[in-house]
Amino acid sequence: MKSSEIRNAFIKYFEKNGHKVVPSSSLIPENDPTLLFANAGMNQFKNTFLGLEKRDYSRAVTAQKCVRAGGKHNDLENVGFTARHHTFFEMVGNFSFGDYFKKDAIHFAWEFLTKELAIPKEKLYVTVHISDDEAADIWHNQEGVPRERIFRFDKDNFWKMGDTGPCGPCTEIFYDHGPKAGTISDPFKGIEAGEDRFVEIWNLVFMQYFENPPGTLTPLPKPSVDTGGGLERMSAAMQGVFNNYDTDLFQPMIQLACKIGNIEYISDKEVLAKNPAAAEVTSALRVLADHCRSTSFLIADGALPSNEGRGYVLRRIMRRAIRYGRKLSADKSFLPGMAEALIESMGSVYPELKTRRDHILNTIRDEEDRFIATLDKGTAILEDELKKAKSKGIKELSGEVVFRMYDTYGFPADLTRVIANEQGIEVNEAAFEKEMEDNRAKSKASWKGKSMGADEAHMIKFAKDYLQSGKSVTFLGYEGTIGDGKVMGLSNGQAEVQELKTGDTGLMILNATTFYGEGGGQSGDVGYIMHDTNRARVINTTKIDDIVLHHVEIEHGSFKVGTAVVTGVDPVERRNTAANHSATHLLHAALRKVLGTHVTQAGSLVDSQKTRFDFTHNKPVSSEEIKKIEDLVNEQIARCNPVQTEMMSHKAALEKGAMALFGEKYASDVRVLTMGDFSCELCGGTHVKNTSEIRLFKIVSEAGVSSGVRRIEAITADNALQYMMSAVTHLDDALAAAGFQKSPHYIKHLETTGETATLANRVESLKDQVKQLEKEMKKLQGGQVNVDDLAANALTFKTKAGASAKLVLADVPLDDRQVLAEVTDHLKNKIQSGIVVVVGQGDGSHPIIVSVSKEISGETKAGDLLKEVAGVMGGKGGGRPDFAQGAAPNRAQLNEAFSKVKSMLGL
């Protein structure tokens, strides 16, 4: 039975039994930054099980895409070496939200397996929790399962959503693959040991309790059911194979890989046990097939390889696959072709694979090209380090080496670990982590000098003590730039003090402030803190937890702990920063609309001068796309939408559709910032009151910062206006230089002046003219050299084989390498067989070209001759046996160099 038939049969069976067919959710969880990837069928129903969301149905059935490759559920390192571990798998499941419970859930599962799939009952075993007599009785009395085929376990048969929340016993169904699949014949022991013969194919969770506090179980008024079965495992059972990789879900990809690499896939366990080389090939093919699935589906759902969060996990999966591909063949590419096979076989079930086909394949090829260069170079360097360690009898690779591989060569630490372990060498994990931590500290300290220095460590303790004492700090900056506060703590940068005087620099903590502390990508405010005639200039503002640190220079008077003060943020700096920050939110929304929903924020920096926004995208943003993005943002600015902020629970914010960043920690109550129906994000920064205050938005640069991450820099308000005014001035100058008359009607003039009607066309036309003139000039330069005379004066020498050949030594007063190369070719054609050495005349460095006829390049190499000539003249160069080029500064030694060539040829 095909896997597609099993999937369809499952859906239809439960639909027939009153279940709502719910499509698979994306692998990228929507509005749940706590979850790395969708890893179970119940993920999309989480709020329903928690009682936070009501649906218009109480029964559901799904075939859910799942990835387990990071966090709590991480199967990555097992993939390829066991029969049933995968990074990507499909979980088919049925769910009851306060509807049916144990009796129906058990009946549905047993009926589907034994009647719809016609699995022999003697091939199945079930497990229940040690306390769940009810489930055991249902299995025996209702479904007729013999008591001896029902086993009881403890923790393995009790499921929890977390430390607190819904939980309950579960019952699992195991399939017996027979004695050939494993060595343990006793089913209880085999199941307990997780042996390959007895494989779990379905788990039924009975959510009948609520745990809170931990250890205290309260019965739920409406128990629910959450079930999940692995399609891969069901397929193996129905297709009569022991290993999931031998099913039709993997074999099309594996067979294609065998064809690409001209290799053989062997699945027989006994054969593999006796043939380590074949076992290595089989494991590599299984890794490739599995990782191709997770890679393709993750990219289709919006993930991109990067160095953080979900993107980093995807990159690890892809690079692990690429490395195993290199083990199979040094010059063959496997992943793109295998991805095409996957799209062909599963695209009808998951149409996103087909609609995003080009994006998937381009992303895979790009990451493969990048990593192979890193892999080849890094592997060679790592092998040298491992050889050194072995020669000294060292069994551990130092953390410094692992960090250097990562930091200098871009070689992933986990890959270093794998390669080292394969050769029996461990990695000093603690030392590596220390190197990483030291590097992070250095990076923080170097960022514009704004980070906390070591001499401020005492303030961290003070800030935390202040918070723990129950005192609060009020931020007044959302209401305005001026406010009242009291000095609560002072530091001179070395220790706490009671007073700062004129000329002192240090840190100041207030109980209330209008100054925004650097955070969330927004720079800290600047301005003044005053009392009476005393004035402190705030040069930067940072934050520890919720305590704002004002970095101050006392310009006049003194400040003491307990002094009442007035805070005044620089209004121009605040206004410009707010415009840039609000524009960043509009930019984020516009990017997702123009480029796709795979775009997510990967970093940002907002200050009064510009906004810098990093985002996930695997190719440059085209000029047409940039224009669309700018138009969308400026359209929202022109609409004069009010910028609304609202405090609400984190859950309510996500339900409202607010964008949340994966990996970001949020408080229970969050600030939601909305601009019309265009943008809705969680944000604690300062913003404009109305989009019209942004005035104008202009992108000034777009570039890549790492694989899969692009960066846009943009300006707003006065900066954008000045930029545009300058651009118009330059345009006017360019128009005049191109022959257009300056006038208010020049645009109309451009439209009616013939084939060079636009400035761009005129510039392109001029560029073509310049290229043609350069070509003609080079032709004239080449014509200045009398090739016939040089060929006629060629010297004759004998090759090692005794044949006659010609030698031309030419001193040519030209510096264009292309022209010199053409002269060299003409000379070689004239003499037919021999050697041509041409030295040009440049400004400080003189080009040298050596060309040798192919029939004698085996005994006399162009590169060797070039090194001698260039060496005499104080230069260097290199090339192929038949052609080489270089340069040298000392033309005075030209005759000596030519004499050297003659002597080498016996002249």
Swiss-Prot record:
This is Alanine--tRNA ligase. The gene is alaS. It catalyses: tRNA(Ala) + L-alanine + ATP = L-alanyl-tRNA(Ala) + AMP + diphosphate. It is an enzyme of class 6 (ligase). Binds 1 zinc ion per subunit. PROSITE patterns: AA_TRNA_LIGASE_II_ALA. Catalyzes the attachment of alanine to tRNA(Ala) in a two-step reaction: alanine is first activated by ATP to form Ala-AMP and then transferred to the acceptor end of tRNA(Ala). Also edits incorrectly charged Ser-tRNA(Ala) and Gly-tRNA(Ala) via its editing domain. It is found in: Cytoplasm. GO terms for molecular function: alanine-tRNA ligase activity; aminoacyl-tRNA deacylase activity; ATP binding; tRNA binding; zinc ion binding.
